[in-house]
Amino acid sequence: MSAFEQLFQGRLPRLVMFDLDGTLVDSVPDLAAAVDQMLLKLGRKPAGVEAVREWVGNGAPMLVRRALANSLEAQGVDDVEAEYALELFNTAYEDSHELTVVYPGARETLKWLHKQGVEMALITNKPERFVAPLLDQMKIGRYFRWIIGGDTLPQKKPDPAALFFVMKMASVPASQSLFVGDSRSDVLAAKAAGVKCVALSYGYNHGRPIAEESPALVIDNLRALIPGCLEPAAEITLPDAVPSHSGNSIVVVTRKLWMKVIKALARWRWRA
């Protein structure tokens, strides 16, 4: 039985929101290379892939602080040094996606959902300047109608603001929405938004099993979302399906829109 069949009583969610790093793509090798290059320029020892794998998930500024502290807690880091180190990291990572790969089943799942008419959004804590180039290189960006980076809004996950915004824009309630992620921040954001969360066992959760965060379901492969493992599923229907707009428009939310976002969220939360 697929995740959709378990969570939505034989129906598809109308909206599926995805995390990026650790969910759709394994970006740790490139992130680790950028972190190590940053550390070497600061006269420090490189951290290595396994350490970086436990540090990612809360955005680039926190990753840099953890690398400087050489610990997950990121304590005792000088703010000025952290700011300079972040510039070094950003420069190193800007065009560094050669080692990043799409996880098995990700492309097939996105393609299947797109064919079923399910709206999709990408909500990541990765700085937005890195998101579009990565999606283009991985050839998965066209599937997402809304793309929100970690610095697009004043809040990032685990704050649910981005989830509320996407649901508002899609006119889809939480009961017909799903979030797919791999970390504690993803699960907390989904729970705060009243959205079911499916978590991937293989992602980045600071070395802790994602099941400890109590998502609605844990899966080992994105194909597990799909009825019949990507086979046609005539028995699975969209609830109250709304015809999609003509064309394949993609909305990349920018910082210029954040005031409108906050106002919209405030009105929506008040009505709720």
From Swiss-Prot:
It comes from the Bacteria. Pathway: Organic acid metabolism; glycolate biosynthesis; glycolate from 2-phosphoglycolate: step 1/1. Its cofactor is Mg(2+). It comes from Pseudomonas fluorescens (strain ATCC BAA-477 / NRRL B-23932 / Pf-5). The keyword Transport does not apply. This is Phosphoglycolate phosphatase. It catalyses: 2-phosphoglycolate + H2O = glycolate + phosphate. InterPro entries: HAD-like_hydrolase_sf, HAD-like_sf, HAD-SF_hydro_IA, HAD_2, HAD_sf, PGP-like_dom2, PGPase_prok.
